[in-house]
Swiss-Prot record:
Residues 189-295 form the RRM domain. The modification Phosphoserine is found at residues 50, 340, 375. Residues 23-35, 389-410 have a biased composition (Basic residues). GO terms for molecular function: RNA binding; zinc ion binding. The lineage of its organism: Eukaryota, Metazoa, Chordata, Craniata, Vertebrata. Residues 42-51 have a biased composition (Acidic residues). Residues 367-377 have a biased composition (Low complexity). It comes from the Eukaryota. It is found in: Nucleus. Residues 419-428 have a biased composition (Polar residues). Highest expression levels are detected in the brain, and lower expression levels in other tissues like epididymis, testis, bone marrow or muscle. In testis, expressed in both Sertoli and spermatogenic cell. Disruption phenotype: No visible phenotype, possibly because of the compensating effects of one or more of the other 3 paralogs (U2AF1, U2AF1L4, ZRSR2). A zinc finger (C3H1-type) spans 157-185, 297-324. This is U2 small nuclear ribonucleoprotein auxiliary factor 35 kDa subunit-related protein 2-like.
Length: 428
């Protein structure tokens, strides 16, 4: 009863309890039947059972031995693979160490070469500095020193003809790209200040081809008035250095001539002093660029057709279009009187004075000022009246021919009375 209580739990429902009791009864019945069969079985069956058990044990042993051998083979194979893997890893490690050692050796060698090169450069720099210092000391001690002569192979320069525009005006529109040679003077009595004079009209000249209304923003009178202000502001500064015998300001519209200022002094020493004084200074928000100019003859530099308003190239002309100086100042230099022989006397001097009084500068600017007034219409009416009266034109033509004959006869008598070489040089 106690075993039954231990086998069957107490806290069960009635249905579960009955099922458990039936299960226990069946179990006991099977056990009982098994004991009876064991008692009734013959001894041969026991021998067969034991033989079967031994056979099963041998088979199990054989199977266990086979499995053990297979395991040994697998283990040996795994050990062999492990050894091969270790060898490969060791070889890779040694190869990596060898590569690192080579890289380190190459890096150290490269660093060594760099140090040697730096030391060599420092040594060369010290040697150059010592040589320069030695040359400076020698120059200070001897007071006579010059640069070493260039190699003989480099002394000869390929011949190139001189640029005529640079020699005449001191500027070339091609600049450094010019195929001809620019003979830059080392000393000259003429100083050139590039693009010193600037106005709104001169700066906007490039827009005329695209903006037809740009010229309405300025006029020639305003530009000339600005030039007069510039003239009275700048010229006294140049005169403080030395005697100025020519002062010209270019009104060209080409970039290489636009606003250039030409100042000719009486001597080259004064021009050198002006160059050292004005070069690099600031004026009107711009830094001045001064240089020596080869122009000493103004008759070949200034465009004569521009003075008569007949220049065919207009704003593309490469000769100087200059403003007229107030009161015709420096008019003697316009005809290169300072470059001519000082022995002109007699009628030749009178003729030169007469020609100077009839300067084309006055004609040009008087025409430009009268262009906007009514004089243009009056001259047009006069020409129309002359065309209507041919007899009057014939009469005036006869009078002019007679006056020319009188002047030519008078000039011939004056030439006969004047010295020959001087008059010939004046005519040429």
């Amino acid at each position: 009863m106690a075993s039954r209580q231990t086998a069957i739990p107490e806290k069960l429902s009635r249905k579960q309890y009955k099922a458990a009791m039936k299960k226990e009864k069946r179990k006991k019945r099977r056990q009982k039947m098994a004991r009876l069969r064991a008692l009734e079985a013959p001894p041969e069956e026991d021998d067969d059972v034991s033989a079967n058990e031994e056979l099963a044990e041998r088979l199990l042993e054989i199977e266990r031995q086979r499995l053990h051998e297979e395991w040994l083979l697998r283990e040996e194979k795994a050990q062999e693979e492990f050894r091969i893997k270790k060898k490969k890893e060791e070889a890779a490690r040694k190869q990596k160490e060898e590569q690192e050692r080579q890289i380190k050796a190459e890096w150290e060698e490269q660093q060594k070469k760099q140090r040697e090169e730096e030391e060599q450069k420092l040594q060369e720099k010290r040697e150059r500095e010592e040589a320069v210092q030695k040359m400076l000391d020698q120059a200070e001690n001897e007071r006579i020193w010059q640069n070493p002569e260039p190699p003989k192979d480099l002394r000869l320069e390929k011949y190139r003809p001189s640029c005529p525009f640079y020699n005449k005006t001191g500027a070339c529109r091609f600049g450094n790209r010019c195929s001809r040679k620019h003979d830059f003077p080392t000393s000259s009595p003429t100083l050139l200040v590039k693009s010193m004079f600037t106005t709104f009209g001169m700066e906007q000249c490039r827009r005329d081809d695209y903006d037809s209304d740009a010229n309405l923003e300025y006029s020639e009178e305003e530009t000339y008035q600005q030039f007069l202000d510039f003239y009275h502001d700048v010229l006294p500064e140049f005169k403080n250095v030395g005697k100025v015998i020519q002062f010209k300001v270019s009104c060209n519209l080409e970039p290489h001539l636009r606003g250039n200022v030409y100042v000719q002094y009486q001597s080259e020493e004064e021009c050198q002093a002006a160059l050292s004084l004005f070069n690099g200074r600031w004026y009107a928000g711009r830094q001045l660029q001064c240089e020596f100019c080869p122009v000493t003859r103004w008759k070949v530099a200034i465009c004569g057709l521009f003075e008569m308003q007949k220049c065919p190239k207009g704003k593309h002309c490469n000769f100087l279009h200059v403003f007229r100086n107030p009161n015709n100042e420096f008019r003697e230099a316009n005809r290169d009187i300072y470059m001519s022989p000082p022995a002109w006397t007699g009628s030749s001097g009178k003729n030169s004075d007469r020609r100077e009084r009839k300067d084309h500068h006055e004609e040009y600017y008087s025409k430009s000022r009268s262009y906007h007034s009514g004089s243009y219409h009056s001259s047009k009416r006069n020409r129309e009246s002359e065309r209507k009266s041919p007899h009057r034109w014939k009469k005036s033509h006869k009078q002019t021919t007679k006056s020319h004959e009188r002047h030519s006869s008078r000039r011939g008598r004056e030439e006969d009375s004047s010295p020959g070489p001087q008059s010939q040089s004046h005519r040429t």
